[in-house]
């Protein structure tokens, strides 16, 4: 069993839950056996076996789930470690770049023609760039490996990595099958040549045997050689026949393996696609539910708050505009009143100046008018009467003066 002594708290809690469930099932089994003690042994033994079988099956399924959980956690930890490693490598490259800029051995910038400093070198351009820009560039360089790692982790979780291994196995089987077919063709060709060679040697032997009575020493030597060659050809033919039989069996086995591997691949891909389809369906439902919750939150909470905020801001703007308008009107009215007061004060000053310019008789007339309390019309009539009497008296005096002269 897997040692869970040094697991994380989450893993230890999961293992504890599994152990509690197993203990619960054992308690159920023990209670069941205690209740069945009063029954017959014939009816008690099959029930105990069935419960033990179910208990073992459940225990095995729980252990399989636990092992899958540990395997998936290990895969995620491995890929997370690779991602952290790529980020650390990017930071290391930045540190090396800054260190190289301070190295005196690679810091020669003198132009021998003009005795001036060479500017705008690539290292200077890199240093003038912002640090986050350089980090982003290195992170983007390691992004490909990170994406590959993330894709591999996703394939490991969904089980597509095993399908990929099955595809690779199919390709290898196909290559082996092609090589086996080629080897079978070569062996069959060699087997055919061996048969032809043996047939030819047997024909020559038969010809020599037909004239056995007239053999010469060379014929005897030739017969011995042909007999040895025939034995060798027979052995070679037998070996090639066995090789052809073996390679044909191997070809049949590879063909059967290829057929079964292709069927298994399509079957597993169908299961994987159904799983992904179900997952995408549930993911779609979850997204729809999330969007629905967001819509309800926006409509019931955020929209009224936004409406109140807009209304309050609009009322504030209207109130501010009205205050500005009232201030402008008050300013205009105040200016108008000040202008009227200025005009009245000017009129009063003009009247006072006019009053100061009046003659003595006008002052006397005004004093008499104010003392007698006569109205303006009555005073004008009295003034006309006095003027007429005055004119009449002046005329009489002028006449008397003329008579006296």
Swiss-Prot record:
Gene Ontology cellular component annotations, sorted alphabetically: mitochondrial inner membrane
Residue ranges that the Swiss-Prot or TrEMBL entry lists as coiled coil: 76-118, 161-194, 230-261, 321-347
Compartments where found: Mitochondrion inner membrane
Organism: Candida glabrata (strain ATCC 2001 / BCRC 20586 / JCM 3761 / NBRC 0622 / NRRL Y-65 / CBS 138) (Yeast)
Lineage start: Eukaryota, Fungi, Dikarya, Ascomycota, Saccharomycotina
Protein name: Sensitive to high expression protein 9 homolog, mitochondrial
Membrane topology category: Multi-pass membrane protein
Function according to Swiss-Prot or TrEMBL: Required for the maintenance of the structure of the mitochondrial inner membrane. Involved in mitochondrial morphology. Causes growth arrest when highly overexpressed.
Complex formation: Homooligomer.
Cysteine pairs bridged by disulfides in the record: none
Chief site of localization: mitochondrion
Tagged with keyword Metal-binding: no
């Amino acid at each position: 069993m897997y040692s869970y002594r040094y697991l994380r708290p989450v893993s230890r809690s999961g293992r504890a839950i599994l152990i509690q469930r197993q203990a619960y099932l054992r308690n159920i089994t023990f209670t069941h056996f205690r209740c069945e003690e009063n029954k017959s042994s014939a009816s008690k033994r099959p029930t105990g076996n069935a419960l033990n079988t179910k208990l073992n099956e459940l225990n095995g399924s729980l252990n399989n789930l636990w092992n899958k959980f540990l395997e998936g956690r290990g895969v995620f930890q491995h890929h997370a470690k690779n991602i952290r490693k790529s980020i650390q490598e990017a930071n290391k490259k930045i540190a090396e770049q800054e260190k190289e800029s301070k190295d005196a051995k690679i810091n020669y910038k003198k132009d021998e023609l003009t005795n001036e400093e060479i500017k705008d070198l690539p290292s200077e351009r890199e240093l003038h760039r912002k640090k986050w820009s350089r980090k982003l560039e290195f992170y983007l360089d390691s992004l490909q490996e990170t994406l590959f790692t993330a894709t591999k982790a996703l394939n490991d979780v969904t089980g597509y990595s095993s399908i990929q291994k099955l595809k690779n196995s199919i390709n290898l089987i196909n290559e082996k099958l092609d090589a086996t077919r080629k080897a079978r063709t070569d062996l069959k060709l060699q087997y055919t040549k061996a048969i032809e060679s043996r047939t030819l040697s047997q024909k020559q032997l038969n010809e020599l045997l037909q004239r056995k009575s007239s053999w010469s020493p060379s014929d005897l030597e030739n017969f011995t050689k042909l007999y040895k060659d025939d034995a060798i050809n027979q052995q070679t033919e037998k070996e090639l026949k066995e090789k052809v039989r073996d390679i044909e069996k191997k070809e049949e086995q590879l063909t059967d393996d290829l057929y079964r591997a292709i069927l298994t691949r399509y079957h597993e891909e169908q299961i994987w696609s159904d799983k992904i389809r179900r997952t995408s369906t549930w993911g779609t439902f979850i997204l729809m539910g999330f969007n629905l919750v967001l819509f309800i939150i926006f409509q019931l909470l955020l929209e009224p708050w936004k409406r109140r905020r807009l209304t309050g801001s609009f009322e504030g703007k209207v109130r501010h505009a009205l205050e500005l308008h009232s201030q402008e009107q008050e300013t205009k009215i105040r200016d108008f009143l000040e202008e009227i007061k200025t005009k009245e004060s000017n009129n009063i000053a003009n009247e006072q100046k006019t009053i100061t310019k009046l003659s003595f008789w006008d002052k006397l007339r005004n004093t008499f008018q104010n003392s007698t309390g006569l109205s303006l019309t009555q005073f004008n009539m009295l003034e006309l009467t006095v003027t007429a009497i005055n004119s009449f008296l002046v005329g009489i005096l002028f006449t008397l003066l003329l008579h006296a002269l």
